[in-house]
Amino acid sequence: MRACHVCPLKKPAGCCKEQTMNIVDQQTFRDAMSCMGAAVNIITTDGPAGRAGFTASAVCSVTDTPPTLLVCLNRGASVWPVFNENRTLCVNTLSAGQESLSNLFGGKTPMEHRFAAARWQTGVTGCPQLEEALVSFDCRISQVVSVGTHDILFCAIEAIHRHATPYGLVWFDRSYHALMRPAC
């Protein structure tokens, strides 16, 4: 007998009226998600498992007390074992004009070529910080939650480095768009 996924009493499947689900196929979900603009980030790590980085838009704040953000990482990604072992990362939010760097870190380019394409500093956690990023969040991974194909990495922020560039970069409708800070 299958247990009801909604009912905390573990009654048989179909017992709860709230169980009605709207099944959304993968393509419909992806098309809908393309309507949500998001900052473009390069996530980096360095530690016992080595140096790695990837492009991500699935990044957001969780709380400011303590300062925490989350990063979603596919467990099937080639970089997953490196991040999983190192347990530190830096979220480097890209500026307008860094689209080619985003594409480089989003592809199958070898790691040494990815990192050779930009200038980096070392953050307090030892992770690479992109010198020309809009902002960099240097973090320790405090918790990992698995959902479907991805791990949600909860990241305790240890340091923040802001840069002077006035232009941000977002991913919207499957393409890059530059944003400019309003004049004060």
From Swiss-Prot:
Gene Ontology BP term (one): uracil catabolic process
Family named by the database record: Belongs to the non-flavoprotein flavin reductase family. RutF subfamily.
GO MF annotation, one: FMN binding
Record field: catalytic activity: FMNH2 + NAD(+) = FMN + NADH + 2 H(+)
Cross-referenced PANTHER family: FLAVIN REDUCTASE, FMN REDUCTASE (NADH) RUTF
Main function: Catalyzes the reduction of FMN to FMNH2 which is used to reduce pyrimidine by RutA via the Rut pathway.
Protein name: FMN reductase (NADH) RutF
InterPro entries: Flavin_Rdtase-like_dom, NADH-dep_flavin_reductase, RutF, Split_barrel_FMN-bd
Gene: rutF
UniProt entry tagged with the keyword Oxidoreductase: yes
EC number(s) per entry: 1.5.1.42
Keyword Nucleotide-binding: no
Entry's induction text: Up-regulated by the nitrogen regulatory protein C (NtrC also called GlnG) and repressed by RutR.
Source taxon at top rank: Bacteria
Protein source organism: Escherichia coli O6:H1 (strain CFT073 / ATCC 700928 / UPEC)
UniProtKB keywords: Flavoprotein, FMN, NAD, Oxidoreductase
Pfam families: Flavin_Reduct
Signal peptide: none
